[in-house]
Amino acid sequence: MIPNPCLLATPLWRYWVDSVISQYIIITIIIINLTIHLASIPVFTSLFLLANFTLWTHINALDASKAPDPPTCPSPPTYTSSPGELRYTGLAVPDQILCVLVNFFTVALHSPAKAHIIHFLVQLLAVVLPLVVERTRDNGSMLISHFVIGTAYQLKGAGVVLPLAYLLIIWRTASVRGSGTKRGTAPLTQRQAESILVSILLGFVLPSVVTAVTLNPYWIALWQPFPWWMSVTQALYLLTVPSPPSSSPSSKPGSGSALFKSTLYTLSTAAAIAHWVFLYHVFTAPSFSLPSLLTFSWLPSLSIPPRDTPHADAFAHFLEWDAVMCYATAFLGALWLLDLARTKTTSVGGWVKEVLGKIFVGVVAGPGAMLCTLWGEREDALVHAWKAEGEKNK
C-alpha cells in the first residue's frame, strides 16, 4: 500500500508553520520590548536635563558673595570649631566634601523650608529603594550598584542622578513577556528580603533618626554616605547568614515577597504620617491661602532666584526642586518597571486610570506611600509571572 503524499507532507507543513509562527512571536516580543526600552531614553534624559537646570543652573547663578554669612570650605581644610570645618576624618579631600555637605544641611535645616526638607528625607527611601532591591534579585544586574550611584547622587543631587539611574535599571531589566534569559524578573527569596530590611533599618533609618534628633554635625556627616551603610550592612548580612538548602521553601523565588511587602507597608505608613504632619504644617502656616494652593504657587519657581538670595533660601530652593525631580523620576520609573513585570499589556485606558489613582494616593498619603504601593504591585506581578512560567514548564 502506497502512503498518501498529503500525509507525508503534513508534518513538514506543520513544522514550517510552527516555525514561522514562533519566529513571528519572538520578533514581535523583541520589537515590543525594544520599543518600551527605547521610549525610556527621551523621557529620562529630559528629566535629567530639567533637573540640571532647576538645580545646578539655579544654584550656580546665585552670587554667594552677596549672601549674609556665606559658609566657606577652604581647600585645604582649616579645622576650626565651626560645624562645617570640624575634623571628621583627618583627610583633606573627604573633610572638604563633608564640610560642604554639613554646611549645606545645617543651613537648610534652619531655613524656612525645614518642614519640607524633613518630609523629603522621609519619602526619599521609597525613591531609592529599587537601587537596593533590583540588584538583590537572583537574576538582577550587577551594574545596578547603590554604593556607586548613591555616592553620585549624594554629591551631585538625587534629582540629577536618579533619572540616569532609573534609565539604567529599566535597560538592565527584561520584560517577563520576553524570551530567553530574563534579568531582574526573579521574585525575592526570604533571605534577600531579610537583607533588604536590615539595610533599611541599619543603613538608613538608624542614622537618619539620630541625625534628626541630635542635629549634631558629626552625625550629619555620618549620615551623608548612607548608601554606603545600606550596601555594607546588606552585604554583611548576606555573608554572615548562610543560604538555606535549595530544597527549603525559603530558598525559592517569591518566598520573601510577604516580608518585603510588610516592609513596604511599614515604610508607606511612616511616609504617610510624615506627609500628614507636613500638610498640617502647610495648612496652618500664616502664609497659607486657598488661592495659592489652587494656583500651584507652592511649587518651587522655574525662574532663577535673585542673585542676592540668602543661602538659606537658595538651599531650600535647591532641595525643593530636588524633591520634585526625585518624585517625578521615581513615579515614571516605577510605572515602567511595573509594566515590565506584567504578563499582559495594559491598555491605554487602564494606564490612565492607574496613573490618576496613584497620583491621588500620592497627594493624600504622600509620594513615599504611593511609590511603596507601586513597588508592592511590581513584586506581586513578578511572583505571578514566575508561577505562570513554572506551570508552563511542567
Model-predicted segments: where are they?
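Long, hydrophobic alpha-helical transmembrane bundles and adjoining juxtamembrane helices/loops
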Residues: 2-394
